[in-house]
């Protein structure tokens, strides 16, 4: 019971997490060039940037050179990189802005490294010249909804070995899951997501986890490098404390798969140790997660709304 309470409190903290955003209209699309006031908001980490577009379109409407542009024409840019709208904003921040401040130029406005200069996160919104490598949005939000549900299906298949759970949801619950994420309604989300999750006494078939490799500061390409493979929540036991040893149906002894064993398996050169970060550290929701944390518990408590734990690898030193 204590474990359930603990996991529940972590999930609540994840859903309560917010990022301060400062969004400006692209100067090339503004009647006043770069003189428009920024749009400031404290935005939930689990939310998606396109949900802001109607408010942004209204906020900047008097300054747009093209008055016929629509909110679903909008897209976001950070330091020249178009942001992938199907990723939650918290993940995007961890990928592009949540880096070691010492590796950034010290000085926007003569700020020194380490003083929190990456916040608020400064983004540029465009309402024209849609990037060719981004899927276009539609006026009714169906493209966003479909992308989210498809991601939920993938996670459901990994957890259960089948996507029957999400496929058998009523239309009301299926749309309700996406609405709960948009509205940051954790109670409504839990009611529906608990239908899809195996009971705590029943382990996942595989854990839905994606690991994002570090972005090179001067890389010519903005494409993300993602590592993903089916990973069971338990592995053959080694030298573990007896309290951590499990027994499989076949009688073999197992131990919980941890963040450390996952990263050592996927990226042994970056994570030569299963217990201690040496060259890189794993970041989820802006925090470094312990290498000893059981990966299934991490997913149950800290997955984004689509059921995936998105771990960002950040280099040390």
UniProtKB/Swiss-Prot annotation:
UniProt keyword annotation of Ubl conjugation present: yes
BP term (GO), one: cellular response to nitrogen starvation
Main subcellular localisation: membrane
Entry annotated with the keyword Nucleus: no
MF GO annotations: Atg8-family ligase activity
Bilayer disposition of the protein: Peripheral membrane protein
Pfam families found in the cross-reference section: ATG5_HBR (PF20637), ATG5_UblA (PF20638), ATG5_UblB (PF04106)
Keywords: Autophagy, Isopeptide bond, Membrane, Protein transport, Transport, Ubl conjugation
Subcellular localization, as worded in the UniProt entry: Preautophagosomal structure membrane
Transmembrane segments: none
GO cellular component, one term: autophagosome
Record note on modification: Conjugated to atg12; which is essential for autophagy.
InterPro entries per UniProt: Atg5, ATG5_HBR, Atg5_HR, ATG5_UblA, Atg5_UblA_dom_sf, ATG5_UblB
Glycyl lysine isopeptide (Lys-Gly) (interchain with G-Cter in atg12) cross-link site: 153
Job of this protein: Involved in cytoplasm to vacuole transport (Cvt) and autophagic vesicle formation. Autophagy is essential for maintenance of amino acid levels and protein synthesis under nitrogen starvation. Required for selective autophagic degradation of the nucleus (nucleophagy). Also required for mitophagy, which eliminates defective or superfluous mitochondria in order to fulfill cellular energy requirements and prevent excess ROS production.
Family according to the record: Belongs to the ATG5 family.
Subunit organization: Conjugated with atg12.
Annotated protein name in UniProt: Autophagy protein 5
